[in-house]
């Protein structure tokens, strides 16, 4: 029996290693050599900022996508950091999709970056919910393969209260514990299982500032 249990433990460990991955996200322009360095370090996903919280396209986005493709990064996502004070959430999504129209086939996810209660959002849960719903509704028909939400238990409730309107979308959450696993995740606002975790932030690697991410 002990032998069987040991075999099961080893099999589970190998399975988890085989089907877990690490990636990076960047908020600045990244050249081809940078992505080649990340690929050599076994990072297989790049998440690139394409819309800034000031309410405009990040023009580093398309060159960074091109460089990630040339370097052979397997999975490329983009993220949109919305500008609440700018209004018109639908336009922010369509502006992003139009900017990326020639790259939509190359992208896996559009992530909506929802963070910063009291800093990037109003003091009204209802107004914030309406804005986020506008982002989600527009994103569903904008041509992206998948749409997800970047947020955390320390951020989302402070923006929308107990609202669970994002629960049907994959969640990418942040907890800088340095652990490449989901053992720390606690369900909140309807989310019961994470898609991806940002486990380390503000790291300098390959000469660039990055955050590190884990997914299975």
From Swiss-Prot:
TM regions (residue ranges): none
GO molecular-function term, one example from the UniProt record: lysozyme activity
Ch-type lysozyme domain sequence ranges: 21-216
GO CC annotations, alphabetized: extracellular region
Glycosylation sites (chain numbering): 31
Keyword set includes Signal: yes
CDD domains named in the record: GH25_Lys1-like
Highest taxon above the source species: Eukaryota
Name of the top EC class for this enzyme: hydrolase
Gene Ontology process terms (BP): cell wall macromolecule catabolic process; defense response to bacterium; killing of cells of another organism; peptidoglycan catabolic process; signal transduction
InterPro entries the record matches: GH25_Enzymes, Glyco_hydro_25, Glycoside_hydrolase_SF
Compartments, as annotated in UniProt: Secreted
Documented EC number(s): 3.2.1.17
Chief location bin: secreted
Keywords, comma-separated and alphabetical: Antimicrobial, Bacteriolytic enzyme, Glycoprotein, Glycosidase, Hydrolase, Secreted, Signal
Signal peptide: 1-20
Reaction it catalyzes: Hydrolysis of (1->4)-beta-linkages between N-acetylmuramic acid and N-acetyl-D-glucosamine residues in a peptidoglycan and between N-acetyl-D-glucosamine residues in chitodextrins
Active-site residue numbers: 25, 113, 115
Similarity field: Belongs to the glycosyl hydrolase 25 family.
PANTHER family assigned: GH FAMILY 25 LYSOZYME 5-RELATED, LYSOZYME PROTEIN
Protein name stated in the entry: Probable GH family 25 lysozyme 5
Source species of the chain: Dictyostelium discoideum
């Amino acid at each position: 029996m002990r032998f069987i249990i040991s075999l099961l433990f080893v099999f589970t460990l190998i399975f988890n290693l085989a089907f877990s991955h690490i990636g990076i996200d960047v908020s600045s322009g990244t050249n081809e050599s940078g992505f080649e360095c990340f690929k050599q370090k076994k990072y297989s996903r790049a998440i690139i900022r394409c819309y800034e919280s000031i309410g405009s396209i990040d023009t580093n986005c398309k060159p960074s996508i091109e460089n990630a493709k040339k370097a052979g990064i397997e999975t490329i996502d983009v993220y949109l950091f919305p500008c609440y004070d700018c209004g018109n959430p639908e336009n922010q999504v369509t502006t992003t999709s139009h900017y990326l129209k020639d790259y939509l086939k190359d992208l896996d996810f559009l992530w909506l970056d929802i963070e910063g209660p009291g800093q990037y959002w109003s003091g009204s849960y209802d107004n914030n919910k309406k804005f986020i719903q506008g982002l989600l509704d527009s994103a569903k028909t904008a041509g992206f393969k998948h749409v997800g939400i970047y947020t955390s238990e320390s951020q989302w409730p402070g923006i929308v209260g107990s609202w669970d309107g994002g629960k049907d979308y994959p969640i990418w959450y942040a907890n800088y514990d340095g652990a490449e696993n989901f053992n720390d995740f606690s369900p909140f606002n309807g989310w019961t299982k994470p898609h991806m975790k940002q486990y380390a932030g503000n790291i300098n690697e390959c000469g660039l500032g990055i955050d590190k991410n884990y997914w299975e």
